[in-house]
Amino acid sequence: KFAYDREFRAYHLFGTTDRSHPGVDAIYRRMGDIAIGGPIWLINRANWGPFEKMRMEPKDTWKLFYEEKKFKTVAGFITGANPLHRGHEYIHRNALEKVDGLFIQPLVELAKREYTRHEFRMLAYRSVIDTYYPKERTILAPLRVTYIFAGPREAVLHAIIMKNFGCTHALIGRDHAGVGDFYHKYAAHEIFDQFTPQELGIDVMLFHEVSY
């Protein structure tokens, strides 16, 4: 166990110490004075409730992508509270022109109450995959983590999560994991200039805002 500096943690994680940032506020409001570290042991696997049947772990996705479907490349897409929209479709369809498979992971453990329930967002994706997207090349599975609203740093975290699930490419749109005006809308693109694909273990595909 060890003590830590809240202000130092906030600045280096979120790029700000402003308490109006929800992540910074959580550090001061929810975290104690002492942190712990060390080996992690799984005692009981948490049940994901309505998403348990759709749950996939990295060992499942690696087997599905490369042993069963024989993919060579897979693009991952982690999406938060917003329901599926045309901007998402643009990213997905562009990716499918370049890679063998698309792996969509909607977050189902969000930090704040949303207008659209997680179950409905998952149903919307399932409907589109069953009726519109190339079904054999598109895989849907929930991701039970929450946004921490770290903007560009969270985009890097999500890219690493996608890599761990077996993706070769990470799809990052504008203002990924952003909140309010704390990060400009392409900060999550620019942070990847600091890393090579070899360092991250995954290629990153960046998408700008589109309109029609």
Q: For each predicted feature, which ranges?
A:
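Active-site cores that bind ATP or allylic diphosphates and position pyrophosphate for catalysis
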Residues: 1-84, 88-212
